[in-house]
Swiss-Prot record:
Protein name per the record: Protein NPG1
Matching PANTHER family: PROTEIN NPG1
Biological process, per Gene Ontology: pollen development; pollen germination
Signal peptide: none
Free-text function comment from the UniProt entry: Calmodulin-binding protein essential for pollen germination, but not necessary for microsporogenesis or gametogenesis.
Gene, per the UniProt record: NPG1
A cellular component annotation (GO) from this entry: plasma membrane
Originating organism: Arabidopsis thaliana (Mouse-ear cress)
Amino acid sequence: MLGNQSADFSEKGEDEIVRQLCANGICMKTTEVEAKLDEGNIQEAESSLREGLSLNFEEARALLGRLEYQRGNLEGALRVFEGIDLQAAIQRLQVSVPLEKPATKKNRPREPQQSVSQHAANLVLEAIYLKAKSLQKLGRITEAAHECKSVLDSVEKIFQQGIPDAQVDNKLQETVSHAVELLPALWKESGDYQEAISAYRRALLSQWNLDNDCCARIQKDFAVFLLHSGVEASPPSLGSQIEGSYIPRNNIEEAILLLMILLKKFNLGKAKWDPSVFEHLTFALSLCSQTAVLAKQLEEVMPGVFSRIERWNTLALSYSAAGQNSAAVNLLRKSLHKHEQPDDLVALLLAAKLCSEEPSLAAEGTGYAQRAINNAQGMDEHLKGVGLRMLGLCLGKQAKVPTSDFERSRLQSESLKALDGAIAFEHNNPDLIFELGVQYAEQRNLKAASRYAKEFIDATGGSVLKGWRFLALVLSAQQRFSEAEVVTDAALDETAKWDQGPLLRLKAKLKISQSNPTEAVETYRYLLALVQAQRKSFGPLRTLSQMEEDKVNEFEVWHGLAYLYSSLSHWNDVEVCLKKAGELKQYSASMLHTEGRMWEGRKEFKPALAAFLDGLLLDGSSVPCKVAVGALLSERGKDHQPTLPVARSLLSDALRIDPTNRKAWYYLGMVHKSDGRIADATDCFQAASMLEESDPIESFSTIL
């Protein structure tokens, strides 16, 4: 019935535009129709179209309304559209546009009729769509959304089994695609976000026969809305899901699913690459600490999308956030190779930071940090402070690698110098203040450490847990246990229940130091109940990084309780606690050390020595196990002189790893005494005595 129903434009000069409408093989200029519209004679204009193009009432009105819309007369277009009984037209079209099977020889003659029916359907649907657009431009957003929704409702009535992949008029498909894309935007603009969510899901789950680009735009818009709208979307309806399919439980999961589907389309060449999609996916996966998944997605991106340097650096950042520092450092080594970008300041700083967390890589990190400092010039000079901070951390970690006392002292001095230099650039950086305080504390400059601990608490407003822990540890090292407990209690009052684990463990150890073992046991029991409740609350969905952030897990609580009972000589309780800890972590040098203490307390020295040696086999750098074996051998050395050199070697090795271990100094003094070296023994006992006066209840390194 209708031929080409689109308006043709041809320019004559700069100002004159002559429009033409074509239908049923007939074309007519719109000059006469527009003149009647200008005079307000809508009915006469409609009659001209009906007579000139052989149209019925709804078709003529639809074309007339579109003409008004194209002319920019939105109010006029609405008046024309209001005169159409669109629902009645839809009902007629529902009968005239059946979903036919692909044409065969018998029904091929019916194809022209089907084409005519689809043209008629498009004309009516386009009228509703343009009415919605007119209302939107006039600021009547809610009305526009309802009109746009009626387009999709009408399509579902006409095509009850969904729009077929073939035999659909292009213009009809274009109208449907525009309406599907417009509806969620209108609901968002009107402020009805739940309707917007429903519209997005309807667009993606119903059969609209959308092209890949249109579908990709809708998926991206929906994902961005879920991530940034602040509206919590309810899970999708189970009725719309295929059995066994994955159902997102919250906004972030649904957004990640959409963005990963989009990336898959990009990789398969089904949609044009959009870099913002990967940026949104990075944000979403970072929110839920799933950067390992992000790295996997980045590895699957087709070559050429990212430069290899950018890919390596982004992968390194993702792996480092996932705790896979070794993989991250290897990627940064490639990126910083002399034939790539050896002076990339950000990559140098990241490499230095990662190396500062591992003693074996600290020397390499020192080189990266020094290169970063040298390259921090001009517009990047503000990053010099970051470079100095990384240099200080790397030097401090390097000082912990077994070396000569002179070299250790030199590295510690240079570490403090670098961190002090960084403070000049970033004097308001709380993290830098904290790290400088810890460096002073590890060197037993407790007065300076206390000052920086208080500065950190002031800088953060007391909102960061590690600041209170640090101050309590410094006070315990100053043997001010009651004050440390007051600080711990104050921190507990200001800390959420789920975050109290490290403070409760600290409080239990303070109780032990003040000879209150009963209260210490009760604190450990409360801590155990808290950790178990937390594990059950989060369930199997709890990520590794989230568990590490708590700093106290169930194994540590059972092990701490076992250590406490061992100090009270409650050996049966120790055995029960160790069994519980062993169920959670089968191999642990610290647990074997406590087991050795248990056997030693029972006067069974062979099993004790075996447990300590097993701990050393498991972790060759375990200082407690080295000291315990050295202590046992030094006791035997009174009767068996040949064991003294072995004990001396083990204790000296322990002191190279941890020169502040007072027990190692004490037992080394005992070895020297048994060996007849009284002067050396005196020096060792004096060192042990001095360290005992500044020994914290937990190592300062536990708060880093």
